[in-house]
Amino acid sequence: KGQYYFYDDVKNVRKNFFISYKGALFEGEKYLGTTDDAFEVVSIFVWVHDAMSLQGLTKEDFLYLEKEILMNYPKAKINWKNPIEQLMKEN
């Protein structure tokens, strides 16, 4: 419980990825688009399966998850769905 795990089939854009982090399960949906010279994942929507599992997580936790996602998808813009979106917009 509470461990970090990233499950993803990077070769299949149609398959969502899953992240288990500090007891919360997140899912990410990948969208293919064009960059300057290739077709790549350019947008990712991430949401949590159970909002109650977010208790105790901080903005720093979500910034860490963004960094981890960007290691696989460096060209992607990460969009969090609510309630995480609200936290990330503040400040």
Which ranges hold each PLM region?
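Cytosol-/stroma-facing membrane-proximal "stalk/adaptor" domains immediately downstream
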Residues: 50-91
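Short glycine-rich, basic-tinged beta-strand/loop micro-motifs
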Residues: 38-53
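A composition-driven signal for long, intrinsically disordered, charge-rich low-complexity tracts
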Residues: 29-31, 43, 81
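N-terminal topogenic membrane-targeting module
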Residues: 1-38
